[in-house]
Amino acid sequence: MLKKRKKILCIMALAALAVGGCSGEKKETDAVFRVGVPHLMATYDHTKGFDGWSTTRIGVGQTVVRFDAEGKLVPWLADFDGNVFTVKDVKFSDGSKVTAKDICDSLTNSCEKNVRARDVMKQSRWKVLADNKFEYIGEKSILTDPLFCIAKGNLYTGGKVISYDARKAVVERNGRKYEYIAIGDSTTRGMSIETGEVDAVFDVNPLYYKNREHEEVGGARTIMGRLNMRPGRPLSDPKLRKTLAECIDLASMEKALRGYVLCNPNYSRYTKSNRTYKPGKADKPATLELLFYDSRPEFKIIAEATQMQAKAAGIDIKLKNVHVNALRDMELGGDFDIVLSSTTNIQSGTVENYYRLYFDSASPENTTKYSNPAFDNAKSLQEMQDVIDKDYAVIVYGNPLHNRVSKKKLAKLNPLDFYYDVDEVK
C-alpha cells in the first residue's frame, strides 16, 4: 500500500513538473519582446511626415515588394510578372482579405496625402485588372518605399497596433507582443541591452557586442552635410562653401568612424567624392550653425570633428542638437547653415531619385535651395555627383554601418533599415 502511495505521489510530481515545464515554455513564448530603436515618428500613419519608416520598422506596414538582405527586389504582398502583379493570400489586421483594388486605392491615397509620394510617383501608373490582379507601370523599386505601405484606413497587413506614441509602440504580431522603445541617446540605447531592459537594440557602439548575439552590415545610407544656399545665408557664397568643404579631412574622419564602407551595390551606388583635402582660410571670419540629432551614434563625432577642422580655417561652427522629429520643420523653415542627414540611398526607389529629392531645383525637399540646370538635366548618377561636387553643394562623409545586438539569434539583418527584423531563429 505504501509503495502504491509513493508511486502515485511520484506520478503526481512528474505531472506537476510537466505542467510547470509547459507553463514556463508558454510564458517565455508569450513574453513581450522589447526592442530599443533610435527613434519613432509622432505617428505610425505612413502618409504623414516625410517617410513612413516607423510603420515598417515596427512590423506593421508592408509594401507590394521589398528589398531582401541581399539587395534583391522580391515580392512581399504581391508576386509580379512584368507589369502585372498578383496579390498574395494576405489579410489586413482585422482579417479582411487584401484585394487589388485595396492596393491601388492605397497607392492613390499616399499620393493624395503626401507631397513626396506625388513627386516620386509622377511617372508611374496603376489600375485594377481583376480582384487579385493589378497593373503597375513605373520603377518597381519605388514600391519598396514605406510611403507606399498598403493600408485601408488605419488597418495594415502586418502586426496590429495596440498603442503608439513617439516614445513607445506596442504591437501584436503572430500571437506575440512587441514593444519598440525609442531611446534617442546612443549610449543610453546601448546600455539598455547591457541592463536587460530590452531584448534587442539597433545602431549602438560595438562595445556592446561582447557575449551577445550581434550582426553588422554596411548600411544603405549616405551621411551628408547639406549646405543652406538660400539668399542672405553665409553659404550662399561659393568661396565660403569651397573653403568649408576642402578644410574637412574626410579620410581621417572615416577612420574615426571605424572605416565605414560602402554597402552592397544593389542598395547604394554612391562613388566617393572626388574632392581633395586642401585646408585653407576663409576670406573673412564666418559663423555657421550646424544641426544634428544624436540618435545616430556617429553624428556627434562628425559634428564635433567638422567644428574643430573648420575652426582652423577661420570658420566658427555652432552645434545644435535637435530631436529628429523637429528637424524637418527646422529645415523647411530654412533657419540653419548645415544639416547632417543620414538617409537611405534608395529612398524613393533608386539612388537617382534620392539625389533628385535633395538637389533638384523643383523638389519640395530641396531645403537648401540649391539650383543648377546642369544638375536638373543630368542623365546619369555620376554626372549628378560631379555637378554637386563642383558646386560644393554638399559634404559627403561616408556610409555608416548598421548593427543589431540581441540576447538571442535573430533573422538576418537587412542593410536597408526600413526593416527592423527581430524574428527569432528557432
Question: Which residues fall in each region the model found?
Answer:
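Surface-exposed binding/hinge segments that line
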Residues: 81, 115-157
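Ligand/substrate-recognition segments at binding pockets and active sites
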Residues: 281-345
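C-terminal motif of bacterial Sec signal peptides marking the signal peptidase cleavage site
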Residues: 19-21
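N-terminal lobe/hinge region of extracytoplasmic solute-binding protein
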Residues: 4, 36-86, 108, 418
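Aromatic- and charge-enriched surface segment that lines or borders ligand/interaction sites
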Residues: 76-115, 192, 234-236
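Extracytoplasmic/peripheral linker and loop segments enriched in polar/acidic and small residues
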Residues: 318-319, 323-327, 352-411, 426
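Extracellular/periplasmic solute-recognition and catalytic clefts
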Residues: 127, 162-172, 179-232
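Local pocket/hinge segments that shape ligand/substrate recognition
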Residues: 202-280, 367-372, 391-406
